[in-house]
Swiss-Prot record:
Span(s) of short sequence motif Involved in the stabilization of the negatively charged intermediate by the formation of the oxyanion hole: 125-127
Species classification: Eukaryota, Fungi, Dikarya, Ascomycota, Taphrinomycotina
Stated family: Belongs to the 'GDXG' lipolytic enzyme family.
One Gene Ontology term of the molecular function aspect: steryl deacetylase activity
Glycan attachment sites: N193
Entries under PANTHER family matching the protein: AB HYDROLASE SUPERFAMILY PROTEIN C4A8.06C, STERYL ACETYL HYDROLASE MUG81-RELATED
Name the UniProt record assigns to this protein: Putative steryl acetyl hydrolase mug81
Intracellular or extracellular location(s): Cytoplasm; Endoplasmic reticulum membrane
UniProt enzyme class: hydrolase
GO cellular component terms, A-Z: cytoplasm; endoplasmic reticulum; endoplasmic reticulum membrane
Organism expressing this protein natively: Schizosaccharomyces pombe (strain 972 / ATCC 24843) (Fission yeast)
Pfam (any one): Say1_Mug180
Biological role stated in the UniProt entry: Required for the deacetylation of acetylated sterols. Has a role in meiosis.
Topology class, membrane: Single-pass type II membrane protein
Gene Ontology biological process terms, A to Z: meiotic cell cycle; sterol metabolic process
Length: 381
């Protein structure tokens, strides 16, 4: 049964939508970013996302959000791949085996005649470790592939990892193990031109498995990703306090402290011993002697994108400073002015309203251009 907290949010949603619409046409809403000021539907989507998420529980996610990546791609084929621009769309790569910590993974696009040197984007999605792949993310990724296909003879194939979710009864560290295992399968097949991309919780998983690779490297020879791209990474899952940008940007972003804290603790199965764990909370895991020796970070092959108005802003700036990245490569830590959480997808790649048909215009947007430029440089080196 739906939680009372979410039911209340659903019943009061029309009031929020009416109020947001009035503000949009008068003094402006809480989302002042240029992309949202000129797109009412996207602004309403962001307002709805914030309002509903405040009442969302893990149980609600289990009821309403349960599609696998395969079924999500099938449902959205007309939206994402209407002209068959994404080769081998939906093709399986790995199959789920719980006892081996292996999840399903699926190609959003895989170039024909793929070779070991072809670039690959390994994507880990966000959603507080509880929500599955969302169409909003897939629209942005499909646009990204289409953009690369106009500028590269061999555009990067994009592999989607459908890792196990808290809403399915799976908790830490299964998600980290699954994502690392898919990466290891790619490595075992000889692929080396791999850049790992993740937003929000996906960013956490990337950093967690980089740390695991670092630990493995003490005993064995390892293969590192060629590049790492983090969009609004969630760095403090269970130990955050409602101070700084968590408080200052409350109501200006699409997520809030209370919801994040609730889902973060569910990720560790409410084990209090893990609430202050530096393995779970990457922002507490900031030993510069470790992170500065991880090749993608050491060589500046890492990009961190986040918004000025998002609640994660301060912890992202703090962590990138503590590990030395902000000082060594300031051009790799980029803040979108007045941007919100995962703005590349919510602000610049709307999945509702007017679609992005002009890729030349799309690639000039701040976050898109930053990611595109970084990926292209990484692939071609």
């Amino acid at each position: 049964m739906i939680s009372l907290s979410l039911l209340y949010r659903i019943l009061t949603l029309p009031i929020i939508l009416v109020g947001t619409t009035i503000l949009y046409f008068t003094i402006g809403t809480n989302f002042p970013h240029d992309e949202l000021r000129h797109n009412l539907l996207s602004t309403l989507f962001c307002s709805s996302m914030l309002h509903l998420s405040k009442g969302l529980t893990v149980k609600d996610v289990r009821i309403f959000f349960h599609d696998s990546i395969g079924s999500t791609l099938l449902k959205n084929r007309k939206k994402l791949n209407s002209e068959n621009e994404l080769p081998n769309y939906g093709e399986k790569f790995t199959h789920k085996y719980d006892n081996q910590d292996m999840p399903d993974s699926v190609w959003l696009a895989k170039v024909n005649g793929m070779t070991k040197s072809d670039p690959i984007i390994l994507h880990l999605h966000g959603g507080m470790m509880a929500l599955p792949y969302d169409k909003v993310i897939l629209v942005g990724l499909s646009n990204l592939y289409k953009l690369f296909s106009t500028t590269m003879n061999r555009p990067p194939s994009i592999l989607l990892v459908d890792y196990s979710l808290v809403s399915q009864g799976y908790t830490y560290p299964k998600q980290v193990r699954e994502c690392l295992n898919v990466y290891q399968v790619l490595i075992s097949k000889g692929f080396r031109n791999i850049t790992v991309l993740g937003e929000s919780a996906g960013g956490t998983l990337i950093l967690s498995f980089l740390y695991q690779i670092s630990e493995l490297s003490k005993l064995n020879k390892v293969v590192w990703p060629k590049g790492v791209a983090l969009i609004s990474p969630w760095l403090d899952l269970t130990n955050a306090k409602k101070i700084g940008s968590y408080r200052a940007n409350d109501g200006l972003d699409v997520i809030c402290y209370e919801t994040l804290n609730r889902f973060g603790k569910a990720y560790v199965n409410n084990e209090e011993s893990l609430f202050t764990s530096s393995v779970v909370n990457i922002n507490m895991n900031c030993d510069i002697s470790i992170w500065s020796k991880i090749p993608p970070i050491q060589d500046g092959k890492v990009l961190v994108l986040f918004g000025e108005n998002e609640v994660f802003r301060d912890e992202i700036l703090s962590w990138t400073s503590k590990i030395g990245l902000l000082k060594a490569y300031p051009n790799r830590v980029l803040m979108d002015k007045q941007g919100i959480h995962i703005g590349l997808f919510l602000e610049e790649s709307p999945s509702i309203g007017p679609g992005m048909t002009n890729l030349d215009i799309w690639k000039k947007k701040f976050s898109v251009n930053s990611l595109y430029t970084f990926l292209r440089e990484t692939f071609e080196e």
